[in-house]
């Protein structure tokens, strides 16, 4: 009898464990995968965003199977602050990441990033490429952090060495010499890979010979492996182009005739804008042949031939990444996981291509703040639609959580925009909020400032203050910039000094002071919680 009891008990236990395992497996299978794609320095220069020059058939095709957000803003127009805000779901004044060198994990050691949160909900999280800032892959966030193609794992290379950008042996020899020299002079600064060479390259090679192509090949192999797991995955895949240098295969350069690419329509700094509003172009200045370019506020003018070459390089880089994504999406279909995968494409900030007599990001102007966001998810009701509802990159964390059906942390400072995917015409946020820290070494007058930006549908207000970098607090008010987006979408004329704009500035200044919570869509759960807490 005792033996029978043990036998029956063993069978019961086995069946129970089997059923639990099946339930867990079934639960995981039902969860959608997440493919989270960052494209560095990508402004909305895509066909689906109305850019008639851009050749981006694959991104456009995905957009026709998803939703396009046409009025999206980053929280800060430079890599580290923008990405730290997006990935933690909190804003720059909360992360305290204000410029490139700030490392969010040192400033916020207990921060729970988006992939960490997904990992807590039984997702297997993997990182390939640039999701956080270059040399800050944040191994804490991933089950498999910072995977790289095998040929880029050389012991003597820096974390993001300049030699990973180029094909030319001559250039790479020069890069190696430069790297070793810089490490001797400033070992701490250059240990993370601050090593630049030519601003462009167009080698006649296969796509996989450049880094982005090699990591796409790795991503395909990784996806094949992940598809066989009985667990949903979150893959963060970050592309380096179209960030400088514009080093991509020649065939993508050949897609564009530089003489047929129109020049920037707003090639002057905004009239009436303060000098410290503009970036110094120090990013471009680091590349060969550009060390002597002037500040945008000076009389310096780049030659038209060079302007066209740079613009051609940017568009070629965008088309290169587009082709790689086409290959990646075809692979998702081939291995049978496309239908059950949330795909997100986002740019971390915009980029000036001669706009405002400048190159690069690092301003509070909308040419730098506006970004593309495209999302495709399983069982989506509306496909191929656009919404002009205002969203922010900080909204991605709660939105992807909701789409995946997992809990949304209540401390996040973004708002899930999932309701816009079911009703693109929904009356949404009243405003978006951004900021930029202007450091003395790159400001026109050698002083330090913080500019706070609020965008509404009609206006864009930028308020500048002095800034105490030690305490992280604003000082005295310095100036305002006001732009009428309806009549001046290229932001050419600062209206802040006009008497008839005083009431507008007062209203917008109050909105800016009240902050993001007061700009929430009506009747969202987040808004109701905030309102109730104020009673």
Predicted regions and their residues:
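Extracellular, beta-strand-rich glycan-interacting domains
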Residues: 487
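Short, glycine/acidic-rich hinge or "gate" loops at secondary-structure transitions
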Residues: 525-526
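Short hydrophobic beta-strand that contains or immediately precedes a catalytic carboxylate
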Residues: 482-483
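Formylglycine-dependent sulfatase
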Residues: 2-9, 13, 22-474, 478, ...
